[in-house]
């Protein structure tokens, strides 16, 4: 079994994944992805003998943020008339480290090119110009506040993810 973690906390066991069971992790602001294989995964979670995938982000800063950083991204896809944007800010306000992020994804059904589906001679089927139920929508907002010092750090964060996935072939 493989478990997915976000900053060391269990998000989901891969055994329970499927097209209609997405992983509740916002991929905006990821710093690194850690892979832990085999028995050493027991340090992070029990029952994960297949390994651990730990997604590390910067929602709770472990060191003081020395400058204000704004990031803005946009992506467009032609196969499904999709768009994806994200905006985030990290900085220091009144001695507290602050991280705010929002991302949105809106993907329509996948287009099927003309003549892409080949039928046996004599067969007749309805022709679709798209793959039904292949659409997806996501909105994710993250907020993190932390305080650091010679003694270490503490922080709190919140993530709100609203996701809707179509399940093709169902």
Give, region by region, the residue ranges found by the protein language model.
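Flexible glycine-/small-residue-rich
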Residues: 6-8, 37, 57, 74
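Short acidic/polar hinge/loop motifs at secondary-structure boundaries
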Residues: 9-37
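Outer-membrane beta-barrel translocator/receptor signature
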Residues: 13, 29-31, 42-114, 135-139
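Extracytoplasmic loops and strand-loop junctions of Gram-negative outer membrane beta-barrel proteins
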Residues: 16, 35-36, 69-71, 123-129, ...
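A generic local structural motif
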Residues: 17-22, 84-86, 141-142
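Structural motif
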Residues: 22-25, 44, 144
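Periplasmic-side early beta-strands and strand-to-turn transitions of outer-membrane beta-barrels
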Residues: 91-170
